[in-house]
Amino acid sequence: MQPLFKRCGAEFFGTFWLVLGGCGSAVLAAGVPQVGIGYAGVALAFGLTVLTMAYAVGHISGGHFNPAVTVGLAASGRFGWRDVPPYIVAQVVGAIVAAATLASIAQGVAGFDLVASKFAANGYGDHSPGKYSMQAALICEIVLSAGFVFVILGATDKRAPAGFAPIPIGLALTLIHLISIPVTNTSVNPARSTGPALFVGGWALEQLWLFWLAPIAGALVGALAYRLVGTPSAQR
């Protein structure tokens, strides 16, 4: 196992890449006239960030890039609880630095208003892309976060085909975005939500609690579900 500072460094860079690539595609490329990538392009971008960084640094840190994933892996017994806080700090800092980088790029075009653009922040109610309620957002984020952690645990199981885990994980994140961008702008990742929210302020910070609570709760559900169905009977 790599030293903790190296693993946290890998988590920093992985989360930085996720937020810069995923949120960057939403802020810079989704609505470009005629050639904008739209929801499908943004969903694919998020999946690609995880797939590429999982191959790049997964062997160093495990490739979490997400506080909810870290908590879910710890709850499943795959990761030590004592390393959860430093991993989460590294992930959140990586997300904030990525959001700052993205803001500096986005503001390089005349007329860009960071707050008015919503800067890929997550929200519900009036701040949901489809105006979905808080209850709908809560259910969506819990269920999809549970599914994401379930896929991660299955794909990284020792009984699963070796070397392919980043592919189903990246595809799962793409699918999650295809489902939930209209609902919450898709979080399933508290660090990803925190970076943009700090720059938007106001409503984004007021609603940030949901995008910590729901993904972590969902991760715990996903971990429990995989323990129930994925653990060999002799080990229960």
Swiss-Prot record:
Protein function: Channel that permits osmotically driven movement of water in both directions. It is involved in the osmoregulation and in the maintenance of cell turgor during volume expansion in rapidly growing cells. It mediates rapid entry or exit of water in response to abrupt changes in osmolarity.
Compartments reported by the entry: Cell inner membrane
The protein's name in its UniProt record: Aquaporin Z
Gene (UniProt): aqpZ
Residues passing through the membrane, by range: 12-32, 37-57, 92-112, 136-156, 163-183, 197-217
Gene3D superfamilies the record matches: Glycerol uptake facilitator protein
GO MF term set: water channel activity
InterPro entries on file: Aquaporin-like, Aquaporin_transptr, Aquaporin_Z, MIP, MIP_CS
Disulfide bonds: none
Record's catalysed reaction(s): H2O(in) = H2O(out)
